[in-house]
Swiss-Prot record:
It comes from the Eukaryota. It comes from Eremothecium gossypii (strain ATCC 10895 / CBS 109.51 / FGSC 9923 / NRRL Y-1056). GO terms for molecular function: RNA polymerase III core binding. One of its GO terms (biological process) is negative regulation of transcription by RNA polymerase III. InterPro entries: Maf1, Maf1_sf. Residues 120-129, 159-174, 181-191 have a biased composition (Polar residues). It is found in: Nucleus. Residues 72-195, 374-397 are annotated as: Disordered. Mediator of diverse signals that repress RNA polymerase III transcription. Inhibits the de novo assembly of TFIIIB onto DNA. The keyword Nucleus applies. This is Repressor of RNA polymerase III transcription MAF1.
Amino acid sequence: MKFIDELDLELVNQTLNFETSESKISGGCDIFTTKPVASDKKLYKTIDRHLESLLQENESYNAAIQQQIELENKRRDPKQAGSDCAEPAEDSPTRNANSFWEQKRRMSVSESPRADTSPLFKSQKLNDQQLKELVSHPLEVPGCKSPSNETSARGVLRRSTSAGSFENNAGSAEQQKRRTSSIGSAANGTKSPILRRSSFNRETINIGPFGPISETASRRTFAYLIGILNASYPDHDFASLKPTDFVKSSRKQLVSKFENSIIALGKQPQEWIWETINAHMDLADCVFYQYNPQESFLDDEPGHLWSLMWFMFNKKRKRVAYFYLSAFRVKNPPSTGGSVALDEYYDSNSKPELREKRRRLTIEHETNDFEGEYDLTYTSSGDGAVEDEDEDMNDAD
């Protein structure tokens, strides 16, 4: 990526660098082209490997979730299937029994069978016997029914002389068929009645605001921001950042947050700054991202208070603008207030060891060795101290 040096952008940077009574503000707007150079290609490969590792971690997590869901289904399916088999159909036995007795009543009052009818209708005892068997052994819930009962039910349907009864039994059979297919599929494990399996596709995994992270365009956009941070802060390496360290923003949010910060610092927003940036970036065609990690790398910088960092990406013009504003605590001691103010400043900003050492050098400190009166009669000639006149007078006496 290549840095674009423009005079009007330099004026923007100078305007956004100032000091207040409590902090020093460092801001600016740097624009880069997305045309890669040799160092960028190496960075792109490093980022690709990093993103692949993130995808593998995500797939491993999803696989663990899938396995947990399958275990839950296996633990709950037998109970569900047993409850389905043990659960009596509320109206099935009664309805089937009433239907069978209704068929028998209609058959008893119907005309006698003709000579050319099938042997099935000639044997009234056979019909009664089959009806009694079906009544004594009603149709069971699908998955628990026996073949003999199913055959008997089919025999009754064939012998039915009522169209209404036939439609009723056909609807019941269709409902039973649907239940059988659902329970059978649950037993085979093709579809879980308890929990749905969460499906994930590698091609649609979104990690951060850049879209599907497996796509080249999404990875390149992420790499552009990493490359700009590396160029702006050469003492740090940002290749290990995650896409989730960035959030997608909008032009309105960016302008509002920036101008509110400027007003809080005692300055008035200036419209020409946005006009200058727009002339180089076409903000209407830009996508906005904000660097918003849990822990900022600037927290290790001495005196760092807060920082705001945005990126404006214009795919058409192949440009990325880095727009930032940071606040640092003022390092210089106050120039007013005399020695008392300086002492308070040094006491509050120096290390405890240095403060203790400085205090020991004062006369009033309790640990100094110079106690009592001071002898100021020492001469520079090395002859020793000058005797007191009072002592000479006493000797003379």
